[in-house]
């Protein structure tokens, strides 16, 4: 079987294969900022291998709450169809248009959720989302806000029943009425 690998040690706004959408930008430190750093806005926002058995990634990020400890809405690492466009903001993390399970939107996301929406547990958590924002698996997580860099390593099996032949790999983050700033490193 053939392996595909890529690594970003820092980011450049003119970098090949880096698609910045909505509020995302690369700052002067080479950090990818996924949400605006400022006043909150209401409701703001591979390759196929037929024997693919799992997907592995590692990344680091910072979540900060400049004006409050009540932060919304979170960060998601996702695999989705290549033509994926930003969806609803706020609790939908820019990935989904509603709460319905939609097999036509073949996607997998790992969310670092900082706000309890009506479909979420009443705690910050890490969730595994397949074709819907309603997590299939949830682990409570005490989110650390501020300048502390958090590290994530993800290993999970990928089903060809969930993902299309080609996918876009990316990050999405949104804020709602409560401000939050998300950076990946």
From Swiss-Prot:
Q: Which GO terms describe its molecular function?
A: carbohydrate binding; metal ion binding
The record ties this protein, via Gene3D superfamilies, to:
2.60.120.200
Q: Which residues bind Mn(2+)?
A: 111, 113, 120, 125
UniProtKB keywords: Calcium, Glycoprotein, Lectin, Manganese, Metal-binding
Q: Which residues are glycosylated?
A: 48, 122
* Any Pfam family the entry gives: Lectin_legB
Report residues binding Ca(2+).
113, 115, 117, 120
InterPro entries in UniProt: ConA-like_dom_sf, Lectin_LegA_CS, Lectin_legB_Mn/Ca_BS, Legume_lectin_dom, Leguminous_Lectin
Q: Which SUPFAM superfamilies match?
A: Concanavalin A-like lectins/glucanases
Q: Which domain of life is it from?
A: Eukaryota
PANTHER family in the record, alphabetically? CONCANAVALIN A-LIKE LECTIN FAMILY PROTEIN, LECTIN
Annotated family: Belongs to the leguminous lectin family.
Q: What else is known?
A: Binds one manganese (or another transition metal) ion and one calcium ion. The metal ions are essential for the saccharide-binding and cell-agglutinating activities.
- State the oligomer form and interacting partners: Homo- or heterotetramer. V.villosa isolectins are composed of either two subunits a and two subunits B (A2B2), four subunits A (A4), or four subunits B (B4). The predominant form, isolectin B4, has no A1 erythrocyte agglutinating activity.
Q: What does this protein do?
A: N-acetyl-D-galactosamine specific lectin. Binds the Tn determinant (GalNAc-alpha-O-Ser/Thr) of the tumor-associated glycopeptide. Could be required for agglutinating cells such as Tn-exposed erythrocytes.
Q: What is this protein called?
A: Lectin B4
Give the species. Answer: Vicia villosa (Hairy vetch)
């Amino acid at each position: 079987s053939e392996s595909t690998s890529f690594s970003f040690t820092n980011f450049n706004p003119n970098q090949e294969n880096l698609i910045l959408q909505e509020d995302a930008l690369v700052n002067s430190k080479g950090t990818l900022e996924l949400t605006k750093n400022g006043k909150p806005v209401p409701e703001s926002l591979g390759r196929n291998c037929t024997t693919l058995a799992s997907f592995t990634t590692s990344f680091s990020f910072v979540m900060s709450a400049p004006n409050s400890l009540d932060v919304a809405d979170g960060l998601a690492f996702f695999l989705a169809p290549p033509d994926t466009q930003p969806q609803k903001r706020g609790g939908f993390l820019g990935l989904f248009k509603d709460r319905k399970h939609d097999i036509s939107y073949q996607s997998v996301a790992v969310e670092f959720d900082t706000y309890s929406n009506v479909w979420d547990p009443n705690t910050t958590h890490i969730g595994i989302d397949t074709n819907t924002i309603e997590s299939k698996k949830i682990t409570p997580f005490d989110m650390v806000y501020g300048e502390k860099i958090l590290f994530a390593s993800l290993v999970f099996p990928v089903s060809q029943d969930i993902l299309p032949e080609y996918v876009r790999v990316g990050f999405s983050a949104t804020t709602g009425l409560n401000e939050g700033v998300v950076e990946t490193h």
